[in-house]
Amino acid sequence: MDKRAMLGAIGLAFGLMAWPFGASAKEKSMVWNEQWKTPSFVSGSLLKGEDAPEELVYRYLDQEKNTFQLGGQARERLSLIGKQTDELGHTVMRFEQRYRGIPVYGAVLVAHVNDGELSSLSGTLIPNLDKRTLKTEAAISIQQAEMIAKQDVADAVTKERPAAEEGKPTRLVIYPDGETPRLAYEVNVRFLTPVPGNWIYMIDAADGKVLNKWNQMDEAKPGGGQPVAGTSTVGVGRGVLGDQKYINTTYSSYYGYYYLQDNTRGSGIFTYDGRNRTVLPGSLWADGDNQFFASYDAAAVDAHYYAGVVYDYYKNVHGRLSYDGSNAAIRSTVHYGRGYNNAFWNGSQMVYGDGDGQTFLPFSGGIDVVGHELTHAVTDYTAGLVYQNESGAINEAMSDIFGTLVEFYANRNPDWEIGEDIYTPGIAGDALRSMSDPAKYGDPDHYSKRYTGTQDNGGVHTNSGIINKAAYLLSQGGVHYGVSVTGIGRDKMGKIFYRALVYYLTPTSNFSQLRAACVQAAADLYGSTSQEVNSVKQAFNAVGVY
């Protein structure tokens, strides 16, 4: 099995080119999109005023219409889809580009306003749509588009017609197909058998051609398995690696059982028994004496305990309440399928296979694996990075970074390897990936060595090594390809990448935009002339990302 295909989750790549103008945070710095010849990241003192924050954005874009090339008034081209205040007091807004009322796929703009000053814009907008002759009425129906997608899944993926589950509603979008935007249907095909899949299809609304497709594993829909009413208790059990853990449970006097239901964190943490089937979520895990020492219990003990650790990490370190920021319940299913060699976040819950005992142990036994997958959930609710090409590699890297930081937070034999606790149990020192030395497992550690093929959604598990190495260097320091990097420690590195993920990245961000986002995040947190900003630049220089 290709270990790069493990730990899957959700990528158009928009080529970017950086053009900094001045060193001060108050002077403009731009990252240009090479494909569309428009800015994809602008920071500095962009515009001041007493208008509402969104009005500043519209005014600035109208003022710079020759640069952004939106055509017409900005308020007619952008729809405000999100607005919040971050921990620094900045007003952060997300806008979606529209063409005659139809959303432009992946074209999201993030704007920051602080004390009446527009300080940054991040995201790729598609220019000059008004100059193109774009159809806004489909020649094929929704039903036809869905049938085309399902048939392609059967022909190319499952080799049989999958038992499709309810997915995201099919919708019309303007899809940036290369340099030729066109009207398309976005179709979601979800299924659990014969293998789990959550495919996104772009179907040309004119002729039914498949324009693009990718497997976005983190968006399936579970059902059943209700919480129980009862008293919060503390149980004890043994995990996959044989270590003892105390876990929060719930005793139901009505049923006379203790359940893996933790009522102390957010809306609860629930762990289910899949019973080696592929129906989610399974049965809420029950035990007669609140002691979970049977070998069959081990995967559930770890899934339950580590979900709590991940919740605590995001709450205590980043002030984030669960993966959605609003204390959503965390649900996990263990013993999924038979010998299933994977784990995944499906948009609503965690799913863990038992492994085959040779390539993998039960996946919930790796705390970095649990942190990795739940971070995909955080990404889903923030940047929404498309799981393909460079945006998908950033998605994977974010999960590796925060999975590793969770492991250090819990101080459970922490290191910079990914999946080392559950991968190839018969081979000492083996792992899925390495952040400190990506080349150790065949992954690139420099942009010049990136994978440019189409396998693995454009190398999402491979090219993540480039960003992993940058994060490692930012934390620990070192010399890489002749570039010296001053380390700033894990905590600051995590703060910078978290802020970049939550407040600057957009669905189609690529590596250059990630660099700009991390530089801006470091400037926000530590000052524009700080060592932290310099170290971010050094780390990305060292891996060839500019």
UniProtKB/Swiss-Prot annotation:
Binding-site residues for Ca(2+) 3, renumbered to this chain: 413, 415, 420
Obligatory cofactor(s): Ca(2+); Zn(2+)
Entry GO CC: extracellular region
Annotated residues for binding of Zn(2+): 372, 376, 396
Positions with a binding annotation for Ca(2+) 1: 287, 289, 291
Keyword Amino-acid biosynthesis carried by entry: no
Primary residence: secreted
EC primary class: hydrolase
Cofactor note: Binds 4 Ca(2+) ions per subunit.
GO biological process, one term: proteolysis
Amino acids binding Ca(2+) 2: 368, 415, 417, 420
UniProt xrefs under InterPro entries: FTP_domain (IPR011096), PepSY (IPR025711), Peptidase_M4 (IPR023612), Peptidase_M4/M1_CTD_sf (IPR027268), Peptidase_M4_C_domain (IPR001570), Peptidase_M4_domain (IPR013856), Zinc_Metalloprotease_M4 (IPR050728)
The UniProt record lists the keyword Metal-binding: yes
Keywords of this entry: Calcium, Hydrolase, Metal-binding, Metalloprotease, Protease, Secreted, Signal, Zinc, Zymogen
Matches recorded under CDD domains: M4_TLP
Active site: 373, 461
Temperature dependency: Thermostable.
Subcellular location, record wording: Secreted
Binding sites annotated in the UniProt record for Ca(2+) 4: 423-424, 427, 430
Stated role: Extracellular zinc metalloprotease.
Protein name: Thermolysin
